[in-house]
């Protein structure tokens, strides 16, 4: 029922976008100079997802973009600096970088949001220094408080800047079972908290567009197009564990999982800002594709050029639980996998076909395209001994 309601709402929102788009195309307006474009601030813009949002917003040429981040001199900030150099060469003034923005500081955020028409607000329980995470979703070290400090600082900054007319939040897929059915795993605290933040801000008078999206991982590989070179090897940005007879995952082989490419998030953020009359104070669900483990195998074998065979191999849940006692890095995917499964909460889309309405606005990333990108289609079978 929840998935059908999401599908119906998405169709209404997409229909509204296409209607307005047709009306605008029939009555074109003069192009505006860069200085006349609305200014959008993107928090945490060195992160995987928010960097993609910055890049996709600049591609539209409809917005000026202010990329906010904390630490200079990191590999992630270098990626932004390279984007700035490319953008300045073609469209001077379209992108500006603002380092030193502490998400816990209302004063810093107030300065960062000044003169902005919109804000992409990303908050996290992770605490890190130059990308080294020290709290990966473990509440005993104060995760809830860490999130709320950022939310309250952001709220104060938004109220101090009435020019901000729309805020976009990026949240997990919706909760369809809590308080409705019994005998389900307890929802992880950071998912439950994030799902409530948009309504918290709305109750304070902030116009929030909430984009529900799944994780940007595919077959235990982080879907990241932001590396300037892409190859199969030892790079943490480009390595995939898919090989002959092995497609890894963290869910059962027959469980349907929604996946996301961060590029698709960036495209839809731009659309939400472009059509505020459609998306103001709306919840909106997106995904790039939806497949089971068995379907991943079928796709990989169909696209491989050498007849190589693959097999879906779930990463043992017992091993993840054991590792979680020693390293915080597996806590997040462990809890995520325990919640979004057959005994817990379902994803927002029941099958790949349910994403067709999204395709009417933006072409979606697909597993087929990524297999080609990773070089999986060129994996040849190993020669058998003898």
Model segments located where?
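Amphipathic terminal alpha-helices
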Residues: 3-25, 351-386
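Conserved hydrophobic beta-strands of the Rossmann-like cofactor-binding core
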Residues: 39-42, 119, 167
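N-terminal Rossmann-like NAD(P)+-binding domain of SDR-like oxidoreductases, especially those catalyzing
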Residues: 162-172
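Terminal hydrophobic/aromatic helix or amphipathic segment near a protein terminus
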Residues: 83, 284, 297-348, 386
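NAD(P)H-binding glycine-rich loop region in Rossmannoid oxidoreductase-like domains
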Residues: 71-163, 176-182
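Oxidoreductase cofactor-interface core, primarily capturing Rossmann-like NAD(P)-dependent enzymes
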Residues: 9-64, 68-80, 104-106, 130-132, ...
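General small-molecule cofactor/ligand-binding pocket signal
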Residues: 66, 96-99, 209, 309-315
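Short, amphipathic alpha-helical "lid/cap" segments that border enzyme active or binding sites
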Residues: 110, 155, 262-270, 364-372
């Amino acid at each position: 029922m929840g998935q059908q309601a999401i599908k119906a709402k998405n169709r209404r929102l997409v229909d509204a976008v296409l209607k307005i788009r047709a009306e605008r195309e029939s009555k074109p307006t003069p192009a505006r100079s860069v200085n006349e474009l609305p200014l959008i601030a993107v928090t945490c813009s060195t992160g995987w997802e928010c960097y993609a949002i910055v890049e996709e917003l600049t591609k539209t040429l409809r917005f000026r973009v202010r990329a906010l981040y904390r630490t200079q001199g990191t590999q992630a900030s270098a990626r932004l600096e390279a984007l700035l150099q490319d953008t300045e060469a073609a469209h001077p003034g379209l992108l500006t970088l603002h380092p030193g923005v502490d998400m816990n500081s209302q004063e810093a955020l107030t300065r960062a949001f000044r003169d902005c028409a919109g804000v992409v607000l990303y908050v996290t329980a992770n605490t890190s220094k130059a990308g080294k995470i020290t709290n990966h979703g473990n509440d005993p070290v104060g995760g809830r408080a860490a999130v709320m400090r950022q939310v309250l600082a952001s709220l104060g900054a938004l109220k101090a800047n009435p020019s901000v007319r729309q805020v976009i939040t990026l949240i997990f897929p919706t909760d369809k079972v809590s308080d409705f059915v019994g005998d389900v795993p307890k929802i992880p605290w950071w998912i439950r908290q994030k799902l409530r933040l948009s309504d918290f801000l709305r109750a304070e008078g902030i116009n929030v567009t909430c984009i529900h999206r799944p994780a940007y991982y595919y077959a235990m590989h982080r879907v990241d197009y932001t590396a300037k070179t892409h190859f199969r090897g030892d790079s943490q940005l480009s390595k995939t564990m898919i090989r002959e007879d092995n497609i890894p995952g963290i869910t059962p082989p027959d469980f349907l999982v929604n996946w996301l490419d961060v590029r698709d998030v960036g495209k839809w953020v731009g659309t939400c800002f472009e059509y505020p009359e459609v998306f103001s104070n709306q919840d909106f669900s997106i995904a790039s594709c939806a497949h089971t483990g068995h379907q991943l195998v079928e796709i990989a074998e169909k696209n491989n050029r050498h007849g190589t065979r693959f097999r879906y191999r779930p990463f043992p849940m017992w091993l993840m639980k054991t590792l979680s006692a020693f390293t915080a890095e597996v806590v997040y995917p462990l809890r995520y996998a325990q919640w979004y499964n057959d005994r817990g909460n379902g994803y927002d889309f029941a099958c790949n076909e349910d994403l067709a309405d999204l395709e009417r606005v933006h072409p979606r990333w697909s597993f087929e395209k990524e297999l080609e990108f990773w070089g999986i289609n060129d994996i040849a079978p190993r020669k058998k001994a003898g």
